[in-house]
């Protein structure tokens, strides 16, 4: 619930200054084995020719967040990516910083 204003601001920021970004979805639902999962923001970058998945976290980054993003990236590789496109990129943005764990996939 607290993430929604941040999601909107990030979406606006990327669409205004990010070259090649096209909005795909907010709280994008994917279904695997009859279970629903939600990715905070999904963009497609025409210049990079790949999906960009963004997950927002209110706390510090931990290993389960990284595993979750890898899960989303694998789903997009298998189900959304076309043969002529590059592999998706994942970004995890956290409200709290941990110097050891910072991720961009």
Residue ranges of each PLM-predicted region?
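Charged, terminal alpha-helix-loop-beta segments
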Residues: 1-105
